[in-house]
């Protein structure tokens, strides 16, 4: 679950939280991880940050 954990961590980073009003929905559960990844893609793209770099800095 390291893959899930790392991308979920992205959701709780200060930078991500500042652009993620639904951060409370991003949990470490598999379903939450899926949502987190979807949100991370949108947020990272909106910040013009490569998704992989956001989740694996």
Curated annotation (Swiss-Prot):
Which protein are we looking at?
Putative ORF3d protein
Per the UniProt entry, what species is this protein from, by scientific name?
Answer: Severe acute respiratory syndrome coronavirus 2 (2019-nCoV)
């Amino acid at each position: 679950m390291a893959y899930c954990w790392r991308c979920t961590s992205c959701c709780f980073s200060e930078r991500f939280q500042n652009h993620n009003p639904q951060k409370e929905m991003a949990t470490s559960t598999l379903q939450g991880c899926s949502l987190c990844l979807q949100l991370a893609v949108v947020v990272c793209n909106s910040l013009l940050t490569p998704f992989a770099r956001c989740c694996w800095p």
